[in-house]
Amino acid sequence: MSWIDKIFSKKPSSDSRRANVPEGVWTKCTACEQVLYRDELKRHLEVCPKCGHHMRIDARERLEYLLDKDSMTEIAADLEPKDILKFKDLKKYKDRLSAAQKDTGEKDALVAMSGTLYGMPIVAAASNFAFMGGSMGSVVGAKFVQAAEEAIEKNCPFVCFSASGGARMQEALLSLMQMAKTSAVLAKMKEKGVPFISVLTDPTLGGVSASFAMLGDLNIAEPKALIGFAGPRVIEQTVREKLPEGFQRAEFLLEHGAIDMIIQRSEMREKLASILSKLMNKPSPFLEPEIIAD
């Protein structure tokens, strides 16, 4: 073999082949560990096409899927958290906020928008778990209240998707206040006869589950969502007992009457539209026009 043949017959190393694959093209399902093409997963709304596992989804992406295109107006987009208490644990709170804002591109853990769903006016909000575990602080509470007030003003339904570890400990009492604040505005909505639909996604825990997340006129969950106050590991360590299989999962809660229904993410938009049209006494967007014979 000549020296030219030797050069051109060399196979590229596995390292060089890996280097040619752009970062972020592939990901792994957190349930079945199947390697998935990122774009395919995005087309399936972050639901594994192999096992059906519902992964966590960005708040803005969720609202863009729910609401009609070109109908969205963000609510309280200018609100930004402040480190009033100068709180510090392993890191300063202001540094945690800066890091979360840089990583997510959001100012805080809740995004709220007004828009339409199949032409029907609604207000919708969604938690971003990637922002400090979706924890509820002053800004999350304020955004939720402003969204609810807008729903009351427009006499249109309010839908909120929760994904949170609970109250934000770095805001101490200011965070706990939001439980009462959000519950109070929902009482006002109930008094005015404006529907509130709570959609609990994985995970919904702590002060969020103990306040607005479980106060819906209808409480809906995504499949296998973890829902509760304390997490299962904390409960097991406290009571020193093994918990039942599937304890605190959406299916367990549905079986025991704690939630009203479970809806697949791919069906959420259509089913919410159907439910809300009934609650608002409006024609369903999916009814076929009646044909009257001559």
From Swiss-Prot:
<keyword id="KW-0808">Transferase</keyword>
<dbReference type="Pfam" id="PF01039">
    <property type="entry name" value="Carboxyl_trans"/>
</dbReference>
<feature type="zinc finger region" description="C4-type">
    <location>
        <begin position="29"/>
        <end position="51"/>
    </location>
</feature>
<dbReference type="InterPro" id="IPR034733">
    <property type="entry name" value="AcCoA_carboxyl_beta"/>
</dbReference>
<dbReference type="GO" id="GO:0016743">
    <property type="term" value="F:carboxyl- or carbamoyltransferase activity"/>
</dbReference>
<dbReference type="GO" id="GO:2001295">
    <property type="term" value="P:malonyl-CoA biosynthetic process"/>
</dbReference>
<dbReference type="InterPro" id="IPR011762">
    <property type="entry name" value="COA_CT_N"/>
</dbReference>
<feature type="domain" description="CoA carboxyltransferase N-terminal">
    <location>
        <begin position="25"/>
        <end position="294"/>
    </location>
</feature>
<dbReference type="InterPro" id="IPR041010">
    <property type="entry name" value="Znf-ACC"/>
</dbReference>
<dbReference type="InterPro" id="IPR000438">
    <property type="entry name" value="Acetyl_CoA_COase_Trfase_b_su"/>
</dbReference>
<comment type="similarity">
    <text>Belongs to the AccD/PCCB family.</text>
</comment>
<feature type="binding site">
    <location>
        <position position="48"/>
    </location>
    <ligand>
        <name>Zn(2+)</name>
    </ligand>
</feature>
<dbReference type="Pfam" id="PF17848">
    <property type="entry name" value="Zn_ribbon_ACC"/>
</dbReference>
<keyword id="KW-0276">Fatty acid metabolism</keyword>
<dbReference type="InterPro" id="IPR029045">
    <property type="entry name" value="ClpP/crotonase-like_dom_sf"/>
</dbReference>
<keyword id="KW-0547">Nucleotide-binding</keyword>
<keyword id="KW-0443">Lipid metabolism</keyword>
<keyword id="KW-0863">Zinc-finger</keyword>
<dbReference type="GO" id="GO:0005524">
    <property type="term" value="F:ATP binding"/>
</dbReference>
<keyword id="KW-0067">ATP-binding</keyword>
<comment type="subunit">
    <text>Acetyl-CoA carboxylase is a heterohexamer composed of biotin carboxyl carrier protein (AccB), biotin carboxylase (AccC) and two subunits each of ACCase subunit alpha (AccA) and ACCase subunit beta (AccD).</text>
</comment>
<comment type="function">
    <text>Component of the acetyl coenzyme A carboxylase (ACC) complex. Biotin carboxylase (BC) catalyzes the carboxylation of biotin on its carrier protein (BCCP) and then the CO(2) group is transferred by the transcarboxylase to acetyl-CoA to form malonyl-CoA.</text>
</comment>
<feature type="binding site">
    <location>
        <position position="51"/>
    </location>
    <ligand>
        <name>Zn(2+)</name>
    </ligand>
</feature>
<keyword id="KW-0479">Metal-binding</keyword>
<feature type="binding site">
    <location>
        <position position="29"/>
    </location>
    <ligand>
        <name>Zn(2+)</name>
    </ligand>
</feature>
<keyword id="KW-0862">Zinc</keyword>
<keyword id="KW-0444">Lipid biosynthesis</keyword>
<dbReference type="GO" id="GO:0009329">
    <property type="term" value="C:acetate CoA-transferase complex"/>
</dbReference>
<dbReference type="GO" id="GO:0008270">
    <property type="term" value="F:zinc ion binding"/>
</dbReference>
<comment type="pathway">
    <text>Lipid metabolism; malonyl-CoA biosynthesis; malonyl-CoA from acetyl-CoA: step 1/1.</text>
</comment>
<feature type="binding site">
    <location>
        <position position="32"/>
    </location>
    <ligand>
        <name>Zn(2+)</name>
    </ligand>
</feature>
<dbReference type="GO" id="GO:0006633">
    <property type="term" value="P:fatty acid biosynthetic process"/>
</dbReference>
<keyword id="KW-0275">Fatty acid biosynthesis</keyword>
<dbReference type="GO" id="GO:0003989">
    <property type="term" value="F:acetyl-CoA carboxylase activity"/>
</dbReference>
<keyword id="KW-0963">Cytoplasm</keyword>
<protein>
    <recommendedName>
        <fullName>Acetyl-coenzyme A carboxylase carboxyl transferase subunit beta</fullName>
        <ecNumber>2.1.3.15</ecNumber>
    </recommendedName>
</protein>
